[in-house]
Structure formats: structure tokens, C-alpha cells
Amino acid sequence: MTTPLADFLRTYAASGMARLHMPGHKGRGPLGCEAWDLTEISGADSLYEAAGVIARSEENAAALFGSAATFYSTEGSTQCVKAMLFLALQNRPAGTPPVVLAARNVHKSFVHAAALLDFEPLWLWPEEGTSSLCACPVAAEGLDRALSALDAPPAAVYITSPDYLGNMADIPAPVSYTHLTL
């Protein structure tokens, strides 16, 4: 597998070219990685309109992950969570309220998205006997109860996996149930 983005950065960093562009550190600094810190300059591609080295790198990542597509983002997973919820809310049936069912151990970016996008999170509480809010396994039965209590389908069901303790959720069960029910 090729490494188009890393290859470009390595070549640019070694070129000795005058950096008359952002960022202001000009490729120098105490960490040693600043030479690889670039903005959208000629050849570096654009994160939001990838057509060159970033696009090829994303294609490689998708092949590695076995996914149909992979997109890099800024802000870590925070921006991805916000974008995902925005799209889910845009695709909900007309006239349905902006509701998202969510396990109680969501990242704070989910809560920020709820405020920014003006939707109401309805919490999926952990099953009896769960000793921590960091571990919030969502069983199909709990999801069934939550869905049954709604007047209309939610825009999305949001489950954090792995959780903050490293536990993996049984994603296939609630996904299968949700697809059958909604």
C-alpha cells in the first residue's frame, strides 16, 4: 500500500522551500514535527475537497478498514459526531420531532451537538445491575421499550462503542432490531 500523504509531507519538509504560508511557525519548533504541519498549499490537497494526495490516502484507508469510504476530519471525532447527527436530523421523515435515542455514556460532543442542532436526546439507561455510567450496555429489550414509548421514529439511535472502559457493545442486536422496527 502506498502512503501518498506521508510521502508528500516528507518530500515537502525536506525540500527547504521558503514557507510563505500558514502556519506561522514556518515548519520550525521544539517538537520536531512542525515541518509536516501544512495548510492547503499546492500539491497538499484540501481536506474538504480532496482530489489529490488526501483523496488517495482516504482511499487507501478505506481499503485497509474494509469500508466503502473513509473521510479524514479535523477536531477528532467531535466534528464527525456533529456531522453524523446533523445528517440524521436532515433525513428524518417530515413532521417528526428531532429526537435521538442515546446511551447515557455519550461523549460531551454529543451533548454539544444536541444544543447546537436543537434536538432532544432521549436517554437509553443501562440495564439493572450495571454499576457504572461509563459502561452503558444497550440491550435490544431496552431499545424496544424506548422505541415503544415514542410517538414517531427517532432520527437516530446513538450507541458509544467501545465505551470509556473498553467494552464493546453488541451492535448487531440493536441495529437489527432498529432496522426491523423503524
Residue ranges of model-derived segments:
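N-terminal "arm"/small-domain region of PLP-dependent enzymes with the aminotransferase-like
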Residues: M1-G52
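Conserved N-terminal alpha-helix of the aminotransferase class I/II PLP-enzyme fold
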Residues: E34-Q79
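Gly/Ser/Thr-rich loops at beta-strand to alpha-helix junctions
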Residues: I54, E75-C80, V106-K108, D163-N167
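Conserved beta-loop-alpha segment that forms the PLP phosphate-binding cup at the N-terminus of a helix
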Residues: A69-G95, S109-A113
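Substrate-binding/gating loop at the entrance of the active-site cleft, primarily
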Residues: A102-F119
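PLP-dependent aminotransferase-class I/II
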Residues: F119-A173
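Conserved small/polar residues in nucleotide/adenosyl-binding loops
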Residues: Y177-L182
